[in-house]
């Protein structure tokens, strides 16, 4: 049995993401045959006792023809209006087709804020887990109607990766109009299908294939989603939506991304992939070694600079002196306190500021180390599409 077949066939919980272009017609509106084929394939999987979360795009592309508009809206307000119309139409069709298999569906609309706030993150998990436990098929989409440019995922690929982590899925399947990852643009005569990816960071491929005319995602976002999922221990398959039955049966089609790590504790999932860092803490080389080689906590003595306006309990990015991202963590002190404490030994802090000040700036159990190199922006209003931390 191949790795891909074993990963898919052995998965008790699957997250399946399907893009707009695989659900709707080129001019907008539901492609009934393709939606029905997808639902039929998923229903067969559910019938044998496996759990499926469907992350579905397509609300905007479904909605704008119903509003009498001939082209996909370009303004945020236009897109939100189309989404409000299309989401109901799309869900109704899903509900009808799943009902023909004796299954119920539940709509789950999420925004970035739902997954960057710990309380909302836990509530989202509880809702999805309850639906799955009741035998209901959760259909997840970004809440385009209320999301603004500053607080939106912008694509459902990364949302699907977060949902896969959230529900502790054993596999993530990304379905679109692209049948696999290629070494070059698929139209190029030199393009070769990449069958298996061991480590995304070592890939040498051209990802500049734009998203379809009815969706927002492209190959770059799919690779980012695959990175997020595999670094959380979730295997990923990227394939064409028309190949969904084969993918679900474990047939080695598309591109298979092997997981890179064991699963993180649930408390770290939010921090690693969903949290928005509120500041940056720069540390010296000794502290970098202590964190990365000995998995130590971050002490004040190793801090050299502080950026941003964070409070105790906020997520922050940990940077090396050369700007490399070391990881993320939950600060135990505010930015003002860390500025005063930086470079001081624990003994000095205890003597001069009291025992509480000698605590770790970031405890090792509230820290996720990174494989990434690029620094993240520091702002309370930064977009969620910044660099992700992967352990």
Swiss-Prot record:
GO terms for cellular component: cytosol. It comes from the Bacteria. Keywords: Amino-acid biosynthesis, ATP-binding, Cytoplasm, Kinase, Nucleotide-binding, Proline biosynthesis, Transferase. Residues 278-356 form the PUA domain. It is an enzyme of class 2 (transferase). Residues 370-391 are annotated as: Disordered. It is found in: Cytoplasm. One of its GO terms (molecular function) is RNA binding. Residues 378-391 have a biased composition (Polar residues). Catalyzes the transfer of a phosphate group to glutamate to form L-glutamate 5-phosphate. Belongs to the glutamate 5-kinase family. This is Glutamate 5-kinase. It comes from Cutibacterium acnes (strain DSM 16379 / KPA171202). The gene is proB.
């Amino acid at each position: 049995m191949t790795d891909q077949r074993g990963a898919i066939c052995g998965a008790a919980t699957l997250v399946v993401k399907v893009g707009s272009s695989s659900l709707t017609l080129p001019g907008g509106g539901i492609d009934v045959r393709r939606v029905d084929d997808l639902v039929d394939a998923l229903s067969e999987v559910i019938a044998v006792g496996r759990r499926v979360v469907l992350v579905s795009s397509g609300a905007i592309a479904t909605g704008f023809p119903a509003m009498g508009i001939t082209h996909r809206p370009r303004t945020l307000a236009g897109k939100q209006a189309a989404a409000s119309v299309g989401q109901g139409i799309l869900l109704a069709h899903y509900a009808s087709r799943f009902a023909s298999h004796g299954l119920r569906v539940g709509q789950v609309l999420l925004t970035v804020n739902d997954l960057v706030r710990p309380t909302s993150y836990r509530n989202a998990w509880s809702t999805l887990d309850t639906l799955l436990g009741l035998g209901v098929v959760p259909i997840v989409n970004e809440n385009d109607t209320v999301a603004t440019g500053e607080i939106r995922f912008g694509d459902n690929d990364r949302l699907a990766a977060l949902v896969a982590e959230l529900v502790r899925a054993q596999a993530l399947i990304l379905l679109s109009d692209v049948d696999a990852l290629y070494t070059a643009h698929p139209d190029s005569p030199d393009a070769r299908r990449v069958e298996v990816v061991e480590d995304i960071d070592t890939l040498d491929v051209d990802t500049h294939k734009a998203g379809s005319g009815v969706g927002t995602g492209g190959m770059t976002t799919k690779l980012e989603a695959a990175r997020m999922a595999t670094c959380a221990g979730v295997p990923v398959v990227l394939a064409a939506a028309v190949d969904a039955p084969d993918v679900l049966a474990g047939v080695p089609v598309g591109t298979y991304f092997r997981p890179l790590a064991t699963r993180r504790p649930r408390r770290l999932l939010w921090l690693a992939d969903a949290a928005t860092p509120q500041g940056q803490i720069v540390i010296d080389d000794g502290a970098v070694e202590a964190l990365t080689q000995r998995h130590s906590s971050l002490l004040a003595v190793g801090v050299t600079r502080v950026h941003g306006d964070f409070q105790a309990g906020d997520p922050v990015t940990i940077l090396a002196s050369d700007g490399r991202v070391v990881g993320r963590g939950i600060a135990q002190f505010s930015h003002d306190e860390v500025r005063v404490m930086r470079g001081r030994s624990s003994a000095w802090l205890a003597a001069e500021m009291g025992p509480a000040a000698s605590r770790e700036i970031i405890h090792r159990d509230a820290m996720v180390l990174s494989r990434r190199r690029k620094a993240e922006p520091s702002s309370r209003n930064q977009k969620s599409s910044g660099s992700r931390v992967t352990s």
